Amino acid sequence: MSETLDVIIIGAGSAGLAALREVRKRTQSFVIINDGPWGTICARVGCMPSKALIEAANAFHHRNTFTEFGIRGADSLTSDIPAILRRVRRLRNDFVASTVKTTEDLGDRAISGRAHLLGPDRLEVNGQILCARNIIIATGSSPIVPKPWNTLGKPIFTTDTLFEQEN
């Protein structure tokens, strides 16, 4: 692209997609750049799958109230962690698919790659220089495990690894 775009959005997470919705109302002269998998952190490894896991935990916890309703046998209920995690992953995949649909029709205006700012109105991605009147930085977050924790001897789960566990 040799022309100066109206907007470049760096990041296709929740904030980047919110920016995209607003930008599309005003101009078609834009690109959105995403480094990593498309689909928001919220949908892929954050808010949405964690709420599905919490929902299962709450459902299991409520077994303690069954006797109030005349329901007997709650003491013999068990949780099937692999089944719970399979459900969480299935729901998560649906959540991600719905967020990815937001960018499917963008064609070459959706770029996979890591953006490197070169100035207030320029950046480089995949060896290509792009210029824009406005650059929105919405790069999101990623988990960090402090190095001393790696010596604790137990697996440390982050949002990037928790939902991939089998049991």
Residues of each region from the PLM?
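Beta1/beta-strand and adjacent pyrophosphate-binding region of the FAD-binding site
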Residues: 1-15
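Glycine-rich flavin
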Residues: 2-5, 22-28, 33-167
